[in-house]
Structures are given as structure tokens and as C-alpha cells.
């Protein structure tokens, strides 16, 4: 289910406080594109992750990381 896929991504990101590329998440979770995209969408709607699009040469890289709120 989408919830289970989102949970798998959440635990992966929560355990390793760094930015992840899409392909890294796909490989680490074993999810298909459709499952991974749905789970990322779920987490984004919940405000659990943020996206950082940075230029590297002529390619735009997509990173996913946890959002931490202190206060």
C-alpha cells in the first residue's frame, strides 16, 4: 500500500540524515517507480520531506530529505 511504502521511505530517511537522490531511494527500498512516486507524494502532502533541486552542470538533480522543525 501507499502508506507502507511511505513508511519504508520515512524510516530510511530518518535513519540516515542526508539528502537522497531518487534512484538511491528506488534501489534502497526496492519500490517500483509508481509505488515510489505515490509514497513521495504522500510524504510531501504530510510535510514530512522537502525537495532541493540543484543545478549540477546542465542537469537538475532532485534530492529528498527530512524536514526538521525545532521550536
Feature map (PLM): residue ranges:
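Short amphipathic alpha-helical interface segments
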Residues: 1-28
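Short, cationic-aromatic polyanion-contact patches
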Residues: 1-6, 54-71
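Long, charge-dense, low-complexity tracts
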Residues: 7, 20, 45, 70-71
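Short loop/turn and capping residues at structural boundaries
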Residues: 24, 37, 54-55
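Short amphipathic alpha-helical interaction segments
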Residues: 31-42
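A short, conserved structural fragment
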Residues: 44-54
Amino acid at each position: 500500500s501507499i502508506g507502507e511504502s511511505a513508511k519504508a521511505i520515512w524510516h530510511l530517511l530518518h535513519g540516515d540524515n542526508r539528502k537522497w537522490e531518487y534512484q538511491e531511494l528506488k534501489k534502497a527500498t526496492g519500490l517500483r517507480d509508481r509505488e515510489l512516486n505515490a509514497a513521495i507524494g504522500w510524504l510531501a502532502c504530510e510535510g514530512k520531506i522537502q525537495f532541493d533541486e540543484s543545478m549540477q552542470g546542465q542537469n537538475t538533480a532532485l534530492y529528498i530529505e527530512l524536514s526538521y522543525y525545532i521550536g
